[in-house]
């Protein structure tokens, strides 16, 4: 199934996600000279995302980042559908990783899964080298949130998201994530170095108990 590009204008929800332990996984497969399972895995993930564009919520698969994607959702996306998309993606990844990638690794990575950063804001379209590109603070914030998901954790966990308070209040406040916690993070070059208040969402059970680190 082919993916569809979606034209984004004005406000948009930016979802950044990547694969945990990707550097170790790539190194493992490279050492064994067997990188085909990784390309096959990413090809399957691309097809899954194309299917979800029609089945769950339309979005623009804006950019592949080497170990994840930047996805752009229209501002009028339904919050329940957006949450379902994130949860379904976690389920797909967990099953497919165990089925098609893990058997080819020499050892199981310490942390398996995906992590997300989500923000909303104005995106400015531009053409660069003949390609549709976007600039906007929301892209920077979503990427920083994704990178900061596991900061301050005593025991890192995957299948979680850091979402800005704006995204939470506009899209997720009336939904039912498995678990939500108020947290703060220091995001590089965001908020002038001040603490950035956000929410952490657990998207796949089992999750950490309430007395574990935020």
Question: Where do the protein language model's features map onto the residues?
Answer:
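Short glycine-aspartate micro-motif
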Residues: 14-16, 113-115, 162
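Alpha-helix/helix-capping structural signal
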Residues: 20, 24, 121-123, 166
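Acidic, metal/cofactor-coordinating or nucleic-acid-engaging core segments within structured domains
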Residues: 47-50, 81, 85-102, 154-160
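Catalytic core of nucleotidyl cyclases, primarily class III adenylyl/guanylyl cyclases
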Residues: 53-81, 99-137
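Glycine-rich, phosphate-binding/catalytic loops in enzymes
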Residues: 31-34, 134-136, 179-180, 194
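Catalytic NTP-binding/metal-coordinating core of nucleotidyl cyclase/transferase enzymes
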Residues: 1-88
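Intrinsically disordered, glycine/charged-rich C-terminal tails and inter-domain linkers
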Residues: 1-4, 151-214
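A contiguous pocket-lining binding segment that forms or flanks enzyme active sites
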Residues: 138, 142-151
């Amino acid at each position: 199934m082919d993916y569809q590009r979606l034209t984004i204008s004005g406000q948009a929800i930016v979802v950044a996600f990547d694969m945990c332990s990707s550097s170790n996984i790539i190194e493992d497969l490279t050492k064994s000279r067997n990188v085909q399972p990784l390309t096959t895995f990413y090809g399957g993930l691309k097809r899954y995302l194309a299917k979800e564009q029609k089945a769950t919520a339309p979005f623009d698969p804006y950019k592949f980042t080497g170990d994840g994607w930047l996805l752009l959702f229209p501002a009028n996306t339904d919050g329940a559908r957006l949450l379902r998309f994130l949860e379904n993606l976690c389920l797909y990844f967990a099953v497919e990783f165990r089925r098609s990638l893990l058997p080819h690794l020499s050892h199981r990575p310490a942390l398996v899964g995906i992590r997300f950063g989500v923000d909303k804001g104005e995106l400015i379209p531009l053409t660069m080298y003949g390609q549709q590109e976007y600039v906007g603070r929301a892209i920077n914030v979503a990427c920083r949130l994704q990178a900061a998901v596991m900061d301050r954790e005593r025991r890192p966990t995957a299948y979680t998201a850091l979402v800005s308070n704006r995204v939470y209040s506009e899209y997720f406040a009336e939904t039912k994530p498995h678990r939500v916690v108020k947290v703060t993070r220091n995001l590089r070059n965001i908020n002038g170095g001040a603490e950035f208040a956000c929410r952490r969402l657990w998207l796949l059970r089992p999750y950490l108990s309430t007395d574990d680190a935020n």
